[in-house]
A protein has these predicted regions:
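Core of compact, soluble alpha-helical bundle domains
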Residues: 1-135
Length: 135
């Protein structure tokens, strides 16, 4: 069973609704990618990337993962990130930027912890060195 299915099964009062739905995700994802692209350790991974498309897929992924009505239609995390040289250090940097973006958007600390806890298992599919995420 995939992470999206697990998250949907356990949420009756979805995180998606609690944080403000699609519009809130748009704000968070925009801020998140500003932070990521300003990070010299991460920006190189996005050279030549269609950022508008990526932001749309990121919003779609978060919406589905957080209990929203939108299905995620993108490729599996392992497939998308394979061979990119992403380490657990990079994953943790990205998670830190996500936390900062959620905080800046006014998401409560307990909800941020839920979100970060939900994405932590993705480290195994995203990072090539398979260490444990520190989110």
């Amino acid at each position: 069973m995939g992470i999206l299915t697990l998250l949907r099964k356990h949420k009756t009062d979805s995180i998606y609704d609690r944080i403000g739905g699609h519009r809130a995700l748009e704000v968070v994802v925009e801020d998140f990618y500003c932070r990521v692209l300003d990070d010299d350790h991460l920006s190189g991974f996005f050279a030549g990337t269609n950022m508008n498309r990526l932001k749309g897929k990121q919003i779609e992924f978060f919406a589905a993962a957080l209990g929203g009505p939108e299905p995620y239609t993108g490729a599996a995390m392992k497939h998308v990130h394979r061979g990119r040289g992403i380490t657990i250090h990079h994953f943790n940097l990205v998670a830190g930027h996500l936390k900062d973006s959620l905080t800046a958007a006014g998401v409560p600390e307990t909800t941020i912890a839920e979100i970060l806890g939900a994405i932590a298992p993705l480290a195994a599919d995203i990072a090539s060195d398979h260490a444990t995420a520190q989110v």
